Amino acid sequence: MTKALDANKVSKIFILGRRENALQETISQTINGTVIPIQCDITSKESLETAYNAVAAQTTHVDLLIANSGVMGPPMKPPQPAEDGSLPPLSQLRDELFNIPMEEFNTVMNVNVTGSYYTVLAFLPLLEAANKRRPAPQEDVLAAPTAQVIITSSIAGFSRKVPFSFAYNASKAATTHLVKMLSTAFAYYGIRVNGISPGLYSSDMADHIFRASGIQGRAISDGSFPKEMIPATRGGSEEDLAGLIVWLASNSGGYINGNILLTDGGRISVAPAVY
């Protein structure tokens, strides 16, 4: 996302994250010198307030806020059936899931849902300031888009199966609905809220899924995945996500509000889902 926005020469990009080395790694992949790193823990209101003040000291407004933090936590899924198809005892299912510390479940919710929520709230004044800078409307002239929030969810939020974690799926279902509620809450303030729900993209979080499927590399070439798993037969690429973000951020995306945009190669079409 940062690379795509930088390549399209936005004026400033502030990136927030806990790890300084990760922030610097992101900057090293950009070319236009627009990226400003700020260390921040989105699970801390005090840290978010400090980050907001740091951004506000360097700009008068924010046109686009992307809440992109997320964690999967440890595996929290039912035990698999035996080779003969027989189910494991319910007591085994109960013990395996119940023995996971509640704090592990709460951490996933705290980062993916609570952290996103408070990140949006923290930066509302700068989003409002962006709208106040918009020029007066002119007849038959398309105005610049209003301020926007984009929250990253996941197709896991629509999945009825649990390939990895009850906590992760539940958190992304909550994130998806959070997008819709915030869109309604801010509609009359002129602040748009949209969500993106990626499928399988090569990333630190998804690498274990790729490995479990015997997938090597980024898996972006056709035929990398069976059609039964992903109809497009490949994982998502940087270009897929970059194009979506740039479109949403541009005038062409200015009429989009309250939407959840899937980018999954058709994965949700062939899996039990609530979409």
Residue spans for each PLM region:
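Canonical Rossmann dinucleotide-binding motif of NAD(H)/NADP(H)-dependent dehydrogenases/reductases
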Residues: 1-14
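Short, small/polar-rich loop/turn modules that mediate ligand/substrate recognition or access, typified
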Residues: 192, 256-258
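Short, flexible catalytic-loop segment of classical short-chain dehydrogenase/reductase
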Residues: 197-208, 212
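A glycine-rich helix->loop->beta "capping" turn
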Residues: 32-36, 53-67, 72-79, 101, ...
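Catalytic loop of short-chain dehydrogenase/reductase
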Residues: 71, 76-109, 125-188, 200-201
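Rossmann-fold cofactor-recognition segment
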Residues: 30-46
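Catalytic Tyr-x(3-8)-Lys segment
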Residues: 212-239
